[in-house]
């Protein structure tokens, strides 16, 4: 099992507006910790988070993979 200091993270930035988007996409942005354009959120790099990023890939961009 990986130690806490070895946990990989991914930083995402919201580049698109949630206005006129389906509710599930808005909820996904909230789940990623984003709500306004150009805000950044650093999250643990897990399959669930990667799936959320893929779902709203037109609204976010990956800034850094660590």
Swiss-Prot record:
The keyword Ribosomal protein applies. GO terms for biological process: translation. InterPro entries: Ribo_uL30_ferredoxin-like_sf (IPR036919), Ribosomal_uL30_bac-type (IPR005996), Ribosomal_uL30_ferredoxin-like (IPR016082). Keywords: Ribonucleoprotein, Ribosomal protein. Transmembrane segments: none annotated. It comes from the Bacteria. Coiled coil: none annotated. PANTHER family: LARGE RIBOSOMAL SUBUNIT PROTEIN UL30M, MITOCHONDRIAL RIBOSOMAL PROTEIN L30. Part of the 50S ribosomal subunit. Belongs to the universal ribosomal protein uL30 family. This is Large ribosomal subunit protein uL30. The gene is rpmD.
């Amino acid at each position: 099992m990986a130690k806490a200091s070895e946990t990989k993270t991914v930083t995402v930035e919201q580049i698109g507006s949630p206005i006129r988007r389906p509710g599930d996409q808005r909820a996904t942005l909230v789940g990623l910790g984003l709500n306004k354009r150009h805000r950044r959120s650093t999250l643990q790099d897990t399959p669930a988070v990667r799936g959320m990023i893929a779902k709203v890939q037109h609204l976010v961009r990956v800034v850094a993979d660590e």
